[in-house]
Amino acid sequence: MMATEKLYVQMLGDFSIRRGDREVVKKGNRSKKIWHLIGILLTNRGQRLAQEKLIQLLWREGDECIDPANSLKNLVYRARMLLDDLVLEDEVCEEGMEFIRFSEGAYMWNEDIPCEIDMEVMTLLAKRGSDEDQAIESRIACYSQAVELYNGEFLPNLGEDEWIFAKRAQYE
């Protein structure tokens, strides 16, 4: 079983995931689909995503994909390999299986692993800042912290997909 050291995920600006002294960062276009999958799973944390839904989100109409189900399995395998870099020295983890789970035809991000995502923290701070029942100093501090977390638009290097545009609009 994996230890419970928290993951820190940055999705505003450069996409990266850090855990302890280990970090994986999206670089270049070669691994774009892998990061796209990870982004979908993290953004929908707590939800089971059917294979069909993931295929629909990952391969747009016109994208050439002969065997989407097999392509998805391969992509999940590659994502798990990438995430293995976050496993700490003293942990036993079977090929990233702890990060991405699969059951009954659906994939999901493992909710048992503590995870802090910049966009979620920023949203929470902005909400606290807008709470008129709080002291003005507290509200200003919350807004200041929220602004500090904004490092750029949501997943800027992952393309032009509709779900990404919808999220970007929330944070602008």
Predicted feature descriptions by range:
Residues 30-39, 65-89:
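DNA-recognition element of transcription regulators
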Residues 17, 44-72, 157, 161:
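Positively charged, aromatic-enriched patches within helix-turn-helix-type DNA-binding elements
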Residues 1-37, 97-106, 113, 152:
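Short boundary/linker motifs that mark transitions into or out of structured domains
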Residues 25-58, 79:
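Short amphipathic alpha-helical recognition elements used for nucleic-acid or partner binding
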Residues 44-47, 61, 82-86, 132, ...:
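Phosphate/oxyanion-binding loops and surfaces in catalytic or ligand/nucleic-acid-binding neighborhoods
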Residues 18-21, 80-91, 99, 124:
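Short regulatory "switch" loops immediately downstream of catalytic or recognition motifs
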Residues 63-67, 92, 99-172:
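Intrinsically disordered, charged and Pro/Gly-enriched terminal/linker segments
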